[in-house]
Design a protein with these regions (language model features):
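Short strand-turn segments of transmembrane beta-barrel domains in outer membranes
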Residues: 218, 227-276, 287, 293-295
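Transmembrane beta-barrel wall of Gram-negative outer-membrane proteins
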Residues: 261-289, 294-334, 357-380, 424, ...
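N-terminal periplasmic "start-of-domain" segments of outer-membrane beta-barrel proteins
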Residues: 50-61, 120-153, 175-176, 204, ...
């Protein structure tokens, strides 16, 4: 009996032994952040268990606190889904595996804004800036509130308010963004990036055959873009070559609902399809055909492929991104703006072009990755890289003594980046990193085909090699920055980057008039950055004020000896391979009665450029030191079912030596953007009016060749009206552009051996097109 009692007691103890383990609760901690990495309070978190029967069960709930943190305690381990939902963002769902005890902290980034969101950020809340995005002049534009710049046609994917986009021809030739007082015709002082995860992937092409710093926005399918961020360019250590006057960063969506879009008019047809194979991925394809709206038919073909996949592996968030693009077309070119000019008596009317032989062919392939490793709640390590191929063959006639020219190249570009972020405390965040980039244009050629034979306008004839180069530009860049609160009402940002640049130029064409100009040179560039901000109390009725300083640079085109100096008749000596600038910026912003106001004042001084290469003619000229002053005022008002954004800029850019205005730099820019989400008959509308004032174009025009040539102002009103049908499964829309003026305005000499210049540009046609979008799968109620 006694032995029986003991045996039962042993069995009972054995059965009770696992109970402490069973009683050990499961603790899941996490943090929710916005697209900038800032804490996102008020997000709703749910842990959902999926049963085979289809009856889902909510196991736990939590709400993120002011610091974005949340804690959920559960009873049972297993594979579940975590869902995060925050106002203004698309819900995020992630499959996780729970184990007993404390699980690794979950980092949730709400990267994709809700399609219902109707906000355009024009004021910089200094409290939201961080060590990765420190510029108080930064503006983030939500894709849903922007208009396609040219729906179904080539060019920039979106129109950015206050930053006109122009090109000196039509067709697939890549347009470039302009900034107040900046003649950024070929992207030289304006940087363009693609946000692959948290990696800033450069889209500029240094020493491009057509123009130094050339960037091609044609590679994007507009539907994959979530946002566009613009900043001053010179005030962030992460932004390097070509980030002088402006940096524009395209943000990508995390997924696409399955769709098919057809856009067309009486001359063009565009088809786009996209879907998401998994919640954190997308595939998109586009095919575009057409002739444009100018008299010279384009015979355009474009094919695009954009794809992205995001993986969550433990504490890693890995983003893979790829692009494939091919395009070709004829490119209607510059024509005289003022037809009454007597020099136009012999001008051949060839249909919106001076030379029907002008054409362009471009193809590129790109792969990139970004790995964000969350070491702890406050520490993060990023590893990134990319590889790209690019080809260009562009035939242009800009009226030089060379006539029709061909600018061609094939290049490879590759790069890598590593950076470490540690937010030690509110008063100190540390960023340290290293970037590497190598661009290798091969057969960077300039050839001449001579002048147009009017009796046989399709004849090209033999070409004459003018110049050819093999170029390698490599940079090794360490950088460091610190950011935080100095006191209750002040914040600071201090940064430094040092670029060690290796430039290797192999001259492939040597003649007595064009001696061999091969060289190899190392150049070191230091770029300090600093921003100090004042954050008053709301009750003080004072604006947020920030003062910034930054030094920036762009690498010069290393090709030299390509032409003669202007007027002197002797070759121009090679200049410095790097041009530097010093920028100062004052930003004041405040919100009054739900209306955001921002004023930005800027002052930029730039070094002289000797032997600068004209991207249109291949000729060399000296460009003296310059000074730019500008003021931009932005006002935004959000309404319940819409928004208004007005931007006005005045600028004055001049050559220090001569005091003359910088040719082709816009001095006045006005932009008004409006959206309306709910109109009668369930219509939705967006409209934008843009005005670019008369620009100085240089000297040489009649009747006084010594006076400043001027062009004409440009006025554009673009709009889109859409209506959903079939429970938002089908959307029909009309896009239109009402325009007057000429884009790409410059001066040109049409005939050889003449010094008289004429104001020329590309006529901007008005048009309308129809868009139909069909969405597959489940749809949400309106």
């Amino acid at each position: 009996m006694h032995r029986n009692y003991i045996s039962r007691l042993v069995v009972l103890l054995f059965l009770l032994l696992p109970l402490p383990m069973l009683a050990q609760e499961i603790v899941l901690k996490g943090r929710v952040s916005d697209p900038k990495g800032n804490a996102l309070p008020g997000a709703s978190i749910q842990i959902v268990s999926h049963a085979v029967s289809g009856n889902d069960r909510i196991l736990g709930k939590a709400t993120s606190g002011p610091d974005g943190l949340f804690v959920i305690k559960l009873d049972f381990p297993g594979n579940v889904n975590l869902t995060a939902d925050a106002p203004g963002f698309r819900p995020v769902t992630r499959a996780i595996s729970l184990r007993r005890g404390t699980n690794p902290q979950i980092e949730i980034s709400m990267n994709e804004l809700s399609p219902r969101l109707d906000s355009v950020s024009v004021t910089a809340d200094v409290n939201e800036l961080n060590v990765l995005t420190p510029d108080p002049a930064m503006r983030v534009f939500v894709r849903q509130d922007l208009l396609d710049a040219n729906p179904g046609r080539p060019g920039a994917p979106v129109s950015i308010p206050g930053y006109p986009i122009e090109t000196a021809s039509s067709g697939i030739k890549a347009p470039q963004y302009f900034a107040p007082g900046v003649a950024g015709d070929h992207g030289e002082p304006i940087a363009q990036y693609i946000a692959v995860g948290a990696y800033l992937l450069p889209n500029n092409l240094s020493a491009n055959a057509h123009g130094n710093g050339y960037s091609d926005p044609n590679i994007f399918i507009p539907e994959i873009l979530e946002s566009v961020q613009v900043d001053g360019g010179a005030f962030n250590v992460r932004e390097g070559n070509h980030s002088v006057n402006l940096a524009a960063t395209y943000g990508l969506r995390s997924h696409l609902d399955p769709f098919l879009t057809i856009t067309g008019d009486y001359r063009d047809l565009d088809l786009v399809a996209g879907w998401s194979p998994s919640p954190d991925s997308f595939l998109a394809f586009e095919a575009s055909y057409g002739n444009g709206f100018l008299d010279r038919l384009e015979h355009r073909q474009q094919y695009k492929f954009n794809a992205q996949r995001i993986f969550h592996v433990g504490e890693h968030r890995l983003t893979l991104f790829g692009i494939g693009y091919f395009g070709r077309s004829y490119v209607p070119g510059l024509v005289p703006i003022f037809a009454e000019d007597k020099n136009d008596n012999d001008y051949p009317n060839l249909g919106d072009t001076t030379d029907p032989r002008q054409k362009d062919q471009t193809h590129t392939a790109l792969v990139a990755f970004n790995d964000v490793w969350q070491l702890s709640q406050s520490q993060q390590l990023q590893l990134s890289g990319f590889f790209r191929t690019y080809n260009l063959s562009l035939f242009s006639n800009f009226g030089s003594d060379l006539g029709l020219i061909r600018q061609s190249e094939f290049r490879t570009a590759a790069g890598g980046s590593a950076n470490y972020v540690n937010k030690v405390a509110e008063y100190f965040s540390l960023l340290g990193g290293f970037d590497y980039e190598r661009e290798a244009p091969r057969r960077d050629d300039l050839d001449s085909y001579g002048f147009l034979n009017r009796s046989d306008p399709g004849y090209y004839g033999p070409f004459t090699p003018v110049d050819g180069n093999n170029i390698t530009i490599g940079s090794y860049t360490p950088y460091i920055a610190a950011e935080g609160a100095l006191a209750r009402y002040f914040r600071y940002y201090l940064g430094w980057r040092r670029d060690e640049i290796n430039i290797d130029n192999e001259d492939l064409v040597t003649t007595p008039q064009n001696p061999n100009d091969s060289f190899q040179k190392w150049v070191s560039v230091n770029s300090p950055k600093a921003t100090f901000s004042f954050l008053p109390k709301e009750s003080w009725y004072l604006p947020l004020i920030s003062l910034s300083f930054g030094q920036s640079f762009f690498t010069e085109d290393p090709r030299t000896g390509m032409g003669q100096g202007t007027g002197a008749g002797t070759p121009v000596a090679p200049g410095s391979p790097v041009a530097t600038s010093h920028s100062y910026q004052l930003v004041a912003s405040r919100t009054v009665r739900n209306t955001d106001f921002k004023v930005t004042l800027g002052h930029v001084t730039s070094s002289a450029e000797l032997g600068k290469i004209d991207p249109d003619t291949g000729a060399q000229f000296d460009l003296g030191p310059s000074r730019l002053r500008f003021m931009t005022v932005a006002v935004r008002r959000n309404f319940r079912q819409g928004s208004l954004l007005a931007t006005f800029s005045k600028a004055d850019a001049r050559d220090f030596d001569s005091g003359q205005p910088t040719p082709e730099a816009p001095r006045t820019i006005f932009d008004l953007l409006g959206t309306a989400q709910r109109l009668p008959w369930r219509l939705q509308a967006r409209g934008e009016f843009e005005y670019v004032g008369t620009k100085p174009l240089g000297a040489g025009c009649e009747p006084n060749p010594n006076a400043e040539c001027t062009g004409t102002p440009v006025k554009e009103f673009r709009g889109a009206v859409v209506r959903p049908f079939m429970n938002e499964r089908l959307t029909a829309g009309i896009n239109f552009l009402i325009a007057s003026g000429y884009t790409g305005q410059t001066t040109e000499s049409f005939y050889p051996q003449t010094v008289i210049q004429e104001a020329v540009g590309v006529r901007i046609p008005s048009y309308a097109s129809v868009t139909l979008t069909y969405r597959f799968g489940r749809t949400s109620a309106p």
